UniProtKB/Swiss-Prot annotation:
Gene3D superfamilies: 3.40.50.12230. Methionyl-tRNA formyltransferase that formylates methionyl-tRNA in mitochondria and is crucial for translation initiation. Keywords: Mitochondrion, Protein biosynthesis, Transferase, Transit peptide. This is Methionyl-tRNA formyltransferase, mitochondrial. Its EC number is 2.1.2.9. InterPro entries: Fmt, Formyl_trans_C, Formyl_transf_N, Formyl_transf_N_sf, Met-tRNA-FMT_N. The lineage of its organism: Eukaryota, Metazoa, Chordata, Craniata, Vertebrata. It comes from Rattus norvegicus. One of its GO terms (biological process) is conversion of methionyl-tRNA to N-formyl-methionyl-tRNA. It catalyses: L-methionyl-tRNA(fMet) + (6R)-10-formyltetrahydrofolate = N-formyl-L-methionyl-tRNA(fMet) + (6S)-5,6,7,8-tetrahydrofolate + H(+). One of its GO terms (cellular component) is mitochondrion. Composed of an N- and a C-terminal domain. The N-terminal domain carries the tetrahydrofolate (THF)-binding site and the C-terminal domain is presumably involved in positioning the Met-tRNA substrate for the formylation reaction. GO terms for molecular function: methionyl-tRNA formyltransferase activity. It comes from the Eukaryota. Belongs to the Fmt family.
Length: 385
């Protein structure tokens, strides 16, 4: 007979494993040890999650519960976190629509479960909580750990131009995020020019399928878990509002485009135009034919310089090393590049007829610390909406 606790690794070293014939204590704090620990499916699962990535894993668990022939999941309940959105986070929405029992952290009901599953939950789980599950808690993480530990792995994958990523199913350990043994890991190529949301859709389906595969052979998967490599550890911290402020003097055109792909769907990139905040909505790479245009090549420019390129109907903005194209912006209202030229750039040139073109420029926006902290909360909410 497999002892679930034996699979938990060195963090329980020196402790005697609990008898495998006992089920975990209930979440009400009462001792609920009347039933034996199951050696095989169907499992009783408590799911912890928040966002769209987590919702796909929950959807797969729900489908498995409803599949009476396969008998993989017998019981499925959900824990999520409070949200500033009246309708709640995607996981809560799905749970309610699917008539699954749902609790708001730290409430977890009082049921008995065999295994916990975490995806995009954002809360450290205590050792006492983990020990309530005979088979521990599994984490579905959208990166190839140990690369991109932390709350924003998909954003950092895109931001840093990774060409390969993946999903890791690992065991949760207390006190630290994303450090437990790897049970299953699969890689996938990052589609060129994909946004974080597009990549999330790919990884969420992969992760959901991997989770079901692990649950089908749970005791064996736990016994075969391997420690994460000590090399190649990187971290993916939360993104703040300040990240969206383009630093024209410091960032290359490739870095600005990656930043747009990474967070543009969530919070648009920001800059200053004549002391007014402007949001850059649609950014594109500038092709060689535009760069070869004498009207572009002949300009004396500095980082932030703005030129309207009539043939492509784009604003060209100079970064640290070259140009990036902007097709639309938000300046009081949404404007195409042509609208912005007609309403603002052309007027600037008329008013400053003797100025150098390099003086017509966007400037780096510096957000106050309080604004960054406030917007960080809103951004975290947007990431899960």
């Amino acid at each position: 007979m497999l002892l679930p606790r034996r699979c938990w690794g060195p963090w329980l070293a020196g402790r005697r494993p609990r008898c495998s014939c006992q089920s975990p204590a209930g979440f009400s704090g009462k001792d609920r040890r009347s039933s034996r620990v199951r050696e095989k499916p169907p499992w009783r699962v408590l799911f912890f999650g928040t966002d769209h990535f987590a919702r796909e894993a929950l959807r797969a668990l729900h489908a498995a519960r409803d599949n009476k022939e396969e008998k993989l999941i017998e019981k499925l309940e959900v824990v999520t976190v409070p949200s500033i959105s009246p309708k709640g986070l995607p996981v809560k929405q799905y749970a309610i629509q699917s008539q699954l029992p749902v609790y708001e952290w730290p409430d977890m009901g009082s049921g008995e479960y065999d295994v916990g599953v975490v995806a995009s939950f954002g809360r450290l789980l205590s050792e006492a909580l983990i020990l309530k599950f005979p088979y521990g808690i599994l984490n579905v993480h959208p990166s190839c750990l140990p690369r991109w530990r932390g709350p924003a792995p998909i954003i950092h994958t895109v931001l840093h131009g990774d060409t390969v990523t993946g999903v890791t199913i690992m065991q949760v350990r207390p006190k630290r995020f994303d450090v437990g043994p790897i049970l299953k890991q699969e890689t996938v190529a990052v589609p060129p020019k994909s946004t974080s949301k597009e990549l999330e859709a790919v990884l969420s389906k992969l992760g959901a399928n991997m989770l079901i595969s692990v649950l089908k052979n749970l005791p064996e998967s736990l016994n075969n878990g391997r420690p994460q490599p000590a090399e190649g550890v990187t971290y993916a911290p939360k993104v703040s509002a300040g990240t969206s402020c383009v630093k024209w003097e410091e960032q290359t055109s490739e870095q600005v485009l990656r930043l747009h792909l990474a967070i543009g769907d969530i919070v648009p990139l920001q800059t200053l135009w004549m002391e007014n905040t402007v949001k850059l909505l649609d950014l594109v790479e500038v092709n060689n034919s535009i760069l070869a245009d004498p009207k572009v090549m002949g300009q004396t420019v500095t980082p932030g310089s703005v030129v309207y390129h009539r043939p492509s109907q784009m604003l060209l903005v100079h970064c640290k090393d070259g140009w990036i194209g902007v097709r639309s912006i938000m300046h009081k209202k949404t404007l195409t590049a042509t609208d912005f030229y007609n309403g603002y750039l052309h007027a600037w040139y008329q008013k400053n007829s003797h100025a150098y073109p390099s003086q017509c420029k966007f400037q780096t926006l510096r957000l106050p610390t309080k604004t960054q902290q406030k917007t960080k909360l809103l951004l975290c909410s947007a990431l899960s909406s």
